[in-house]
């Protein structure tokens, strides 16, 4: 019996050491860490990082575009699209979700209510009461959808890029990596396998001059990894936010008759292109852009094509 206890104790130590190695040097984010070109907005659940981009020239239309990023990659992912919208006279607001980028990492459930609440809270904080154009990438798609479902009078148009909500659910062995204790250990110890080097992009090369290359992407992505709470926010999102099947919500959106656009890569290995047919069934009036060689990273690998199409859609839906 004593031998068994010793073996169990040693095994627990062996398992704990890699977790300790991954977490012991993490910092708690504070205001001194955020880039000077952005700011923190104090919301109900904590401080969230945001940044404004102002329109250029004389063609200012007074309308606002809000960009909502996806699961793990924060707001820098929009770098190749922002100028196009500003040049057309739109004000552009970007922000990092709680747990990502330069926002705080509150210890709460990262469910759809949190993401909707934080978007509404940011708009209120910035005193935006008129309708806005919402653009959501990957997980940002369902966030746009659930927000619009709750606040249809605040949404002027919806643009979705490879939107989540049409994926196969985790099952079997994969489902165990979200269980209490096991999940925390696994997501920290095997972080590089989940979101690390080699999993950032499906596309190894892009000739788009506005694309974010792999080195630049990794440099910006890794800035958030030094802070406590990033991994926990991802794990909590997987546990609390159903990103696999959002068809009921999309069907409800179809009844609102709000102008909707979607861009999808035919070779998307994260949210399969077949989801575009499901989305058209839910929202019959949706405008679809198919990128033949596009994967899940079209937002930053083909930003010129995606940006021009969305910009045309936005201009056609101005007041």
Task: Give short role names for the model-derived ranges.
Residues 1-63, 87-90, 247, 315-319:
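Alpha/beta-hydrolase fold catalytic core
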Residues 29, 189-255:
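Conserved alpha/beta-hydrolase catalytic His-Asp/Glu region
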Residues 43, 51-57, 97-135, 151, ...:
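Active-site loop/oxyanion-hole signature of alpha/beta-hydrolase fold enzymes
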Residues 53-102:
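Conserved HGGG/HGGXW glycine-rich cap/lid loop of the alpha/beta-hydrolase fold
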Residues 136, 140, 144:
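Gly/Ala-rich beta-loop-alpha elbow adjacent to hydrolase catalytic centers
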Residues 149, 157-188:
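Flexible "cap/lid" loop of the alpha/beta hydrolase fold
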Residues 256, 262-264, 268:
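Short beta-strand/loop motif that positions the catalytic acidic residue
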Residues 270, 294-307:
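Catalytic histidine-centered segment of alpha/beta-hydrolase-like enzymes
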């Amino acid at each position: 019996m004593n031998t068994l206890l010793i073996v169990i104790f040693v095994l627990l130590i062996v398992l704990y050491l890699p977790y300790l190695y991954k977490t012991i040097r993490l910092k708690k984010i504070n205001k001194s860490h955020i880039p000077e070109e952005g700011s923190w907005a104090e919301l109900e659940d904590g401080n969230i990082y945001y940044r404004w981009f102002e329109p250029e020239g004389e063609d200012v239309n007074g309308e606002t575009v809000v960009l909502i990023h996806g699961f793990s990659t924060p707001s820098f992912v929009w770098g190749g699209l922002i100028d196009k919208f500003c040049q057309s006279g739109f004000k552009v607001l970007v922000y990092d979700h709680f747990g990502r980028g330069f926002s705080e990492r509150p210890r709460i459930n990262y469910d759809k209510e949190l993401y909707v609440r934080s978007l509404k809270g940011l708009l209120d904080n910035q005193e935006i009461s008129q309708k806005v154009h919402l653009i959501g990438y990957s997980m940002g798609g369902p966030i746009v959808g659930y927000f619009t479902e709750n606040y249809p009078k605040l949404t002027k148009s919806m643009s979705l890029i490879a939107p989540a909500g049409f994926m196969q659910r985790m099952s079997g062995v994969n489902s165990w990596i979200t269980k209490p204790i096991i999940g925390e250990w696994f997501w920290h110890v095997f972080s590089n396998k989940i979101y690390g080097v080699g999993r950032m992009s499906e596309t190894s090369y892009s000739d788009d001059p506005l694309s974010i290359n792999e080195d630049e992407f990794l440099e910006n992505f890794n800035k958030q990894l030094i802070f406590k709470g990033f991994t926990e926010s991802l794990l909590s999102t997987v546990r609390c936010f159903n990103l696999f099947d959002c068809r009921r919500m999309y069907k409800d959106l179809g009844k609102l008759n709000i102008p909707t656009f979607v861009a999808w890569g035919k070779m998307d290995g994260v949210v399969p292109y077949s989801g575009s047919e499901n989305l058209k069934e839910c929202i019959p009036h949706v405008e679809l852009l198919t990128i033949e060689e596009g994967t899940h990273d079209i937002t930053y690998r083909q930003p010129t094509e995606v940006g021009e199409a969305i910009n045309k859609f936005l201009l056609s839906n101005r007041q």
